[in-house]
Amino acid sequence: MENPLYNDWSLLLEDEFKKDYYLRLRSFLKKEYTEEKIHPAMEDIFNALHFTPFHKVKVVILGQDPYHGPDQAHGLSFSVQPGITIPPSLKNIFKELTHEFGMSMPTHGHLTHWAKQGVLLLNNVLTVREGKAHSHRGQGWEVFTDKVIQTLNQKDHPVVFLLWGGAAQKKGELIDTNKHIILKAPHPSPLSAYRGFFESNHFSKANQILHKNNVEEIDWTLPESPSQG
């Protein structure tokens, strides 16, 4: 089985691509990408791992599954492609950032600037059918992303996990909290953001934890143009 990764994640996860569950997932995806409209594009599926190598991971933001609208998803949780309207949950994330740092509201939702600094923007499920939320649940991605979380437990310096909502917090059961830090809040969706996501101060708290551990903090502001990210 060909390993689709090309940085330090490649060696760490290479055994996963030989396992039965992944071979079944791969067969399922080949059929889906042939017969249906699937997001993100096949070459973008592993962008979270490609943009944020293992050795650079400082913060993890767990999402559920990719956006299922046209041209939104590009392999990073909560992020959208340049030129795409900022979705409601991401808009609420930006509102929280403006509250915490007094920054102006970003004009785009392309989060590669965060990913390149060490923020792993990982979804629980990495693909979805257009217009059908959660349509690729239970096909094997959850096993793969569990392995990503378990692999992060090996890191020497503390990683800060931002877990928003019940699904992400369930994944948190895999995290070694003797070494790493979990910050929990409701999901930033308009349905739940007012129940404690707003004013959670997760972004500034994450930076405080990094600073305390002599790790460079994240610049949560976004460049004016996505191409500068």
Swiss-Prot record:
Enzyme class at the top of the EC tree: hydrolase
Subcellular location: Cytoplasm
Active site: D65 (proton acceptor)
One GO-annotated biological process of the protein: base-excision repair, AP site formation via deaminated base removal
CC per GO annotation: cytoplasm
Highest taxon listed in the record's lineage: Bacteria
Matching InterPro entries: UDG_fam1, Ura-DNA_Glyclase_AS, Uracil-DNA_glycosylase-like, Uracil-DNA_glycosylase-like_sf
NCBIfam families: PRK05254.1-1, PRK05254.1-2, PRK05254.1-4, PRK05254.1-5, ung
Family: Belongs to the uracil-DNA glycosylase (UDG) superfamily. UNG family.
Function: Excises uracil residues from the DNA which can arise as a result of misincorporation of dUMP residues by DNA polymerase or due to deamination of cytosine.
Name of the molecule in the record: Uracil-DNA glycosylase
UniProt source species: Oceanobacillus iheyensis (strain DSM 14371 / CIP 107618 / JCM 11309 / KCTC 3954 / HTE831)
Organism classification: Bacteria, Bacillati, Bacillota, Bacilli, Bacillales
